[in-house]
UniProtKB/Swiss-Prot annotation:
<comment type="function">
    <text>Could be involved in insertion of integral membrane proteins into the membrane.</text>
</comment>
<keyword id="KW-0472">Membrane</keyword>
<protein>
    <recommendedName>
        <fullName>Putative membrane protein insertion efficiency factor</fullName>
    </recommendedName>
</protein>
<keyword id="KW-1003">Cell membrane</keyword>
<comment type="similarity">
    <text>Belongs to the UPF0161 family.</text>
</comment>
<dbReference type="Pfam" id="PF01809">
    <property type="entry name" value="YidD"/>
</dbReference>
<dbReference type="InterPro" id="IPR002696">
    <property type="entry name" value="Membr_insert_effic_factor_YidD"/>
</dbReference>
<dbReference type="GO" id="GO:0005886">
    <property type="term" value="C:plasma membrane"/>
</dbReference>
Amino acid sequence: MMKKLLIVSVKAYQKYISPLSPPSCRYKPTCSAYMLTAIEKHGTKGILMGIARILRCHPFVAGGVDPVPEDFSLMRNKNTSKNEKF
């Protein structure tokens, strides 16, 4: 139940709030798409992963490809290169 509520909340953000501002995510997949995948893979712990990702998404990082890891982690996915661009 909680998982579905979180997914609906993120999808509502993607549909109604995100289009109001220019694209600014430095990662691929976007932070909201990352949050959805993290919640689907890791349940409610995925919200922590999504928040950690949002906190990493700022102008002082290179960004790049950063998929959701298979195991729960609040760190950037170590299987991808920091210099890998999308």
